[in-house]
UniProtKB/Swiss-Prot annotation:
Homology family: Belongs to the EF-Ts family.
Record NCBIfam families: tsf
Record's subcellular location: Cytoplasm
Organism annotation: Streptococcus pneumoniae serotype 19F (strain G54)
Name of the protein in question: Elongation factor Ts
Pfam families assigned: EF_TS
Region Involved in Mg(2+) ion dislocation from EF-Tu, annotated ranges: 80-83
Keyword annotations of the record: Cytoplasm, Elongation factor, Protein biosynthesis
An annotated GO cellular component: cytoplasm
Length: 346
């Protein structure tokens, strides 16, 4: 039987990423054959990964990488926040973002076939990571954005990499694009414009806003405060020419009832119409980038600010770790019971 030296164990660990004991056991089982030991570790790793496949991985990091006129933002998940801070995990995320940006896959299936610097496919690299790190590690999603030479990328990560943003700006400069990405990270828009919102979605969100107003009015009634009116509209998509004309007519009637002279109406009406638009586009403000108040200049919307500096936003992508993943509630008593049962059965 071949002697299993510390040098041999170290060599296997460097090639496989396995722990000391796992590497030593593999060498013992393969009589010191490095290549067979690597294959054995890979098989064991796949078995370990398969056992973890059904676990929920909702922690992790985003990765952002810019490669010339192509940028990628990705999300990689782990089971715990602790592992998400692991140096091996962070390196895996950053490497994956680079491979995605350079490989430009069309979908997740294509991305899994890309070759990592280790020579493994991306899919195999994640199986290996699951085995060596000891938690389910999964590549969840990516977005690729391309720009022209005249446009600018804004790349930004927030909260230790839990949020990743890429934006493309025409006009302006890279600093403006980064500021815009910071806004996107903070304000969570999901689409660029009201034109991208589904009609039924707007109706549902408007109903929810009015439900909140109803709850607020119950509290106001208890302290004899006047009730707040319901919102009639939630999006610019609902503000037809007829609706806007009626709003202006209502404002004029209000000014006449207040006895305001007609010669000053032209100075008052624009401000009141701006207020009408603001009050009746609450859904747009929550979900569309252009309608949001710009965090770098709260006197303007994003759209108005960009117009003031002769710039426009072309596209953006925002990932936040765990979005849409339902986390399993941990039942501590059940977990302890299962652990004790397993121990008794061994």
């Amino acid at each position: 039987m071949a002697e299993i030296t510390a040098k041999l164990v170290k060599e296997l660990r460097e090639k496989s990423g396995a722990g000391v004991m796992d590497a030593k056991k593999a060498l013992v089982e393969t009589d010191g054959d490095i290549e067979k030991a690597i294959e054995l570790l890979r098989e064991k790793g796949m078995a370990k990964a398969a056992k973890k496949a059904d676990r929920v991985a909702a922690e992790g990091l985003t990765g952002v990488y810019v490669n010339g006129n192509v940028a990628a933002v990705i999300e990689v998940n782990a089971e715990t926040d602790f592992v998400a801070k692991n140096a091996q995990f962070v390196e895996l995320v950053n490497t994956t973002a680079k491979v995605i940006a350079e490989g430009k896959p069309a979908n997740n299936e294509e991305s899994l076939a890309l070759i990592m610097p280790s020579g493994e496919t991306l899919e195999a690299a994640y199986v290996s990571a699951t085995a060596t790190i000891g938690e389910k590690i999964s590549f969840r999603r990516f977005a690729l954005i391309e720009k022209t030479d005249a446009q600018h990328f804004g790349a930004y990560q927030h909260n230790g990499g839990r949020i990743g943003v890429i934006s493309v700006v025409e006009g302006g400069d890279e600093a403006l694009a980064k500021q815009l990405s910071m806004h996107i990270a903070a304000m969570k828009p999901t689409v660029l414009s009201y034109k991208e919102l589904d009609e039924q979605f707007v109706k549902d969100e408007l109903a929810q806003l009015n439900h909140v107003i109803d709850q607020d009015n119950e509290s106001r009634a208890m302290v004899n405060k006047p009730a707040l009116p319901h919102l009639k509209y939630g999006s610019k998509a609902q503000l037809t020419d007829d609706v806007i004309a009626q709003a202006e007519a209502d404002i004029k009637a209000e000014l006449a009832a207040e006895g305001k002279p007609e010669k000053i109406w032209d100075k008052i009406i624009p401000g009141k119409m701006d207020r009408f638009m603001l009050d009746n586009t609450k859904v747009d403000q929550a979900y569309t980038l252009l309608a949001q108040v710009y965090i770098m200049d709260d006197s303007k919307t994003v759209e108005a600010y960009l117009e003031s500096v002769n710039a426009s936003v072309v596209e953006f992508a925002r990932f936040e770790v765990g979005e849409g993943i339902e986390k399993a509630a941990n039942d501590f008593e059940a977990e302890v019971a299962a652990t004790m049962a397993a121990a008794l059965n061994n």
